[in-house]
């Protein structure tokens, strides 16, 4: 019987003070909601800033890729005919008349430049 009286008195006290704290709880909930909205706003601003940074990086990478696509035009390798009717020789090679097969095809060939 004593335990029931103790529990009932605790129930009455909890009900009484629970109602008194309800206004405080509502104020705390409002503060929590406002803080969440602030955090959401700040997170959104940070995301926008990050997005702008990523777009800047992407544009620089695309520029580099475009530069990479503007490579040297097709060129002839070593021992390939060259001249006015053919593509130019690649870098490091020169278009010269050779003794080997130049006489047969009647055109100069791309060869490593001679030092003479």
UniProtKB/Swiss-Prot annotation:
Pfam families reported in the protein's UniProt record: Toxin_22
Q: In which tissues is it expressed?
A: Expressed by the venom gland.
Q: Which residues form the signal peptide?
A: 1-20
Tell me a Gene Ontology molecular-function term this record carries: toxin activity
| Positions of the propeptide segment | 21-74
- Localisation per UniProt entry: Secreted
Which protein family is it in?
Answer: Belongs to the neurotoxin 14 (magi-1) family. 06 (ICK-Trit) subfamily.
User: How are the domains described in the entry?
Assistant: The presence of a 'disulfide through disulfide knot' structurally defines this protein as a knottin.
According to UniProt, the name of this protein is U16-barytoxin-Tl1c
Organism of provenance? Trittame loki
Highest lineage ranks of the organism?
Eukaryota, Metazoa, Ecdysozoa, Arthropoda, Chelicerata
């Amino acid at each position: 019987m004593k335990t029931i009286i103790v529990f009932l008195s605790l129930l009455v006290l909890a009900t009484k003070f629970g109602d008194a704290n309800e206004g405080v709880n509502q104020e705390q909930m409002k503060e929590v909601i406002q803080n969440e909205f602030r955090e959401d706003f700040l997170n959104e601003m940070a995301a926008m800033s990050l997005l702008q940074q990523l777009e800047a990086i992407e544009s620089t990478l695309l520029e580099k890729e475009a530069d990479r696509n503007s490579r040297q035009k097709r060129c002839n390798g070593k021992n390939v005919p060259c001249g006015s009717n053919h593509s130019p020789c690649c870098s490091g090679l020169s278009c010269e008349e050779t003794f080997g097969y130049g006489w047969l095809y009647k055109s100069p060939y791309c060869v490593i430049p001679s030092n003479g």
